[in-house]
């Protein structure tokens, strides 16, 4: 299975966020702008982190914001948000975060497949710093291994 679609509208470079909630909200807005999710999906992603802690910070500098499949998800989609200034999520080892991925999937099977595919992308130690430094949507897609 390939990564979920990554529309140009879902790539936000140099976003300003004062805290992790604003960073996650930026990822949710990018998913909404791409048509993958409703704006309320950002609230669901934030709620998951409030309930379960900073488990979404999956590697140094990288958060994978997501929520359960539900009515807020319109179709599978991915968002990439780089932050002008990194923010802390409260993770003991992987803060601060400079790249927030937003993941919206319609079912649990797609969720597992998407996470596995993303893990393959980030097996490359250079991927996170490269994304954080990216200046164009095409550059982000190249780093993510998505055909242009």
Predicted regions and their residues:
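Cytosolic covalent-transfer regions centered on His/Cys nucleophiles
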Residues: 1-148
């Amino acid at each position: 299975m390939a990564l979920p679609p990554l529309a140009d509208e879902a790539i936000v470079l140099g976003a300003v966020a004062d805290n992790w909630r604003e960073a996650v909200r930026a990822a949710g807005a990018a998913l909404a702008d791409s048509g993958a999710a409703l704006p309320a999906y950002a609230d669901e992603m934030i709620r998951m982190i409030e309930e379960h802690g900073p488990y979404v910070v999956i590697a140094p500098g990288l958060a994978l914001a997501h929520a359960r499949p539900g009515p807020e998800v319109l179709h599978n989609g991915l968002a990439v948000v780089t932050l002008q200034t990194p923010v802390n999520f409260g993770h003991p080892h992987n803060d601060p975060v400079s790249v927030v991925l937003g993941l919206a999937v319609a079912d649990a099977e797609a969720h597992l497949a998407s996470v596995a595919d993303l893990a393959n992308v980030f097996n490359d130690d250079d991927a996170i710093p490269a994304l954080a430094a990216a200046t164009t949507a095409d550059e982000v897609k190249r780093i993510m291994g998505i055909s242009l």
